[in-house]
Design a protein with these regions (language model features):
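Extracytosolic ligand-binding ectodomains
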Residues: 2-11, 22-412
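Short, glycine/charge-rich beta-strand/loop segments that flank catalytic centers
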Residues: 14
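N-terminal signal peptide c-region/cleavage motif recognized by signal peptidases
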Residues: 17-19
Length: 412
């Protein structure tokens, strides 16, 4: 790995005080919001990462990639050790923590980080130090379009997710006779919301669907009352929010407070798939739809799901969701590449990531598989659409993998 001169100096100093990596372990840095408004997301991500590491290191014999346990066999049974860092949802804090993990903790790779805005800075640091960054759950499509060599993303991005939404609108309209004619876009003001809205506008235009309102708001706002009034006035067929947890809760409560019941809500995941959201708004969440990369109800096609969910639930007292399913998968894929590299050399790990070709049935995800293109994007990740029924998300699309029929009130 060709590190900058100042980084080499930092490493020499760190090694001099005895913090070199042990040969019997593989140290990976995980960056998440452990404090602040999305602290619960960070806590859940930590539990997911620890579950994945336990599957790899332990003896659970789960029917999935690296599920036999015992550590990484091509590294003599070396165990995965995770070092967690709190970026607090702040891109600059994320930058500093990524650099600390590389220069002081000597991690061989980074993984994270929930908010796409933090991934933008983390991945820049990773590229500068030539250390792989595995994007577990960042969905902004611009992240893999910056010419970075060390960026890899297992999950679909928001263009892929949005395409699934508009495919659903087309197919549910044809199936029921109740077509979507208008949408309201509602999005927070960071790279996540902006990129999501841009993709949705383009696809709405292509589908001949009117964008009745395009509402941009400041993330973690204390109030969304003005924005809720705009949504009510637009009265579109579908509200399409791109919001983190606290904003998702405010939105649903605000709509209820003004007496407005949307015909349909199609969320860009994020806060809408968190148990904290469902718990906070209760029956107001019923019928909410979201794109997802993970389907808990797909255990027939993915037999590892029940075992992995049980291990995660024992640790965190809740089932896997879209975010935690992606986080587990990303760490397993990263660990598999390190194992295939047979080395802690970052360049060899990168080469192994480039060569990744994992069938979907070796994962817990409803994907064709994992294979990265030249930009580091997994091209074989296929989203699903889910809907909350009885406080639980159920897969409703594609129709051939649906566990439940969609409740569709548009046009009624």
């Amino acid at each position: 790995m060709q590190r900058p001169a100042f980084a080499i100096a930092a490493l020499v100093l760190a090694v001099g005080i005895g913090s070199a990596r042990a040969a019997d372990e593989v140290v990976i840095g995980a960056l998440y919001p452990m404090t602040g408004p999305n602290a619960q997301v960070g806590a859940d991500a930590k539990a997911a990462m620890e579950t994945a590491a336990d599957i790899i290191n332990g003896n659970h014999n789960v029917p999935m990639l690296l599920g036999k346990g015992g550590g990484l066999d091509k590294l003599g049974g070396a165990k995965i050790r995770l070092i967690f860092a709190d970026h607090q949802g702040d891109p600059q804090k994320a930058r500093a923590e990524a650099e600390r993990l590389i220069t002081q903790e000597h991690v061989v790779a980074l993984i994270g980080s929930y908010q796409s805005a933090t991934a933008a800075t983390i991945s820049q640091v990773a590229d500068r130090y030539e250390v792989p960054y595995m994007s577990a759950d960042n969905s902004s499509p611009s992240l893999n379009q910056r010419g970075l060599k060390w960026f890899f993303r297992t999950s679909p991005h928001d263009v892929m997710f949005t395409q699934a939404m508009f495919d659903f609108f087309r197919d549910i309209g044809a199936k029921t006779g109740h077509k979507v004619s208008s949408v309201v876009l509602f999005h927070e003001d960071t790279i996540f919301g902006t990129d999501s809205s841009n993709a949705q506008k383009q696809m709405a235009d292509a589908a001949g669907i009117k964008v009745a309102a395009d509402i941009r708001y400041r993330g973690n706002s204390p109030s969304l009352s003005a924005e809720v009034q705009q949504i009510k006035a637009a009265d579109a067929d579908v509200i399409m929010p791109s919001s983190y947890t606290s904003d998702a809760i405010l939105l649903m409560r605000g709509l209820h407070d003004v007496g407005y019941t949307p015909k349909a809500i199609m969320a860009q995941s994020a806060g809408f798939v968190e148990q904290a959201f469902i718990d906070a708004v209760g029956p107001l969440a019923e019928g909410v739809m979201s794109r997802s990369a993970f389907a808990l109800d797909a255990s027939k096609a993915r037999p590892a799901i029940p075992a992995v969910d049980a291990l995660y639930k024992a640790r965190n007292n809740k089932d896997l969701n879209d975010n935690t399913g992606r986080e587990i998968t990303a760490l397993v894929v990263l660990a598999d590449a390190i194992n295939r590299a047979g080395s802690l050399d970052e360049d060899k790990i990168r080469q192994a990531l480039v060569a990744t070709d994992i069938p979907g049935n070796q994962t817990i995800m409803p994907w064709k598989g994992v294979k990265f293109d030249a930009t580091g994007q997994n091209t074989e990740a296929s989203p699903v659409i889910q809907q909350i029924k009885g406080g639980v998300y159920h897969t409703i699309y594609p129709f051939d993998v649906a566990a439940e029929p969609a409740v569709w009130n548009v046009g009624k």
